[in-house]
């Protein structure tokens, strides 16, 4: 399936947002996710299905000082 992750095209086999995070190597990382412009909390990632052509944003919190 073809999706966009952080404005880059990806061909993935994942069908859920949680599976996508694992497939892209983000498992265990503290990240925030959005699907098609809507925030998806960590508790809903496993049941959030990815449609073909989905727009996914994955961001890591930044620390500053």
Model-predicted regions and their roles:
Residues 1-64:
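Ubiquitin-like/PB1-type beta-grasp interaction modules and other compact soluble beta-rich domains
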């Amino acid at each position: 399936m073809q999706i966009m992750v952080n404005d880059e095209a990806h061909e993935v086999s994942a069908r859920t947002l949680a599976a996508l995070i694992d497939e892209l190597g983000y498992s265990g990382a503290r990240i925030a996710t959005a699907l098609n412009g809507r925030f998806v909390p960590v508790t809903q990632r496993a049941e959030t299905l990815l449609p073909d052509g989905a727009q996914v944003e994955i961001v890591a919190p930044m620390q500053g000082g």
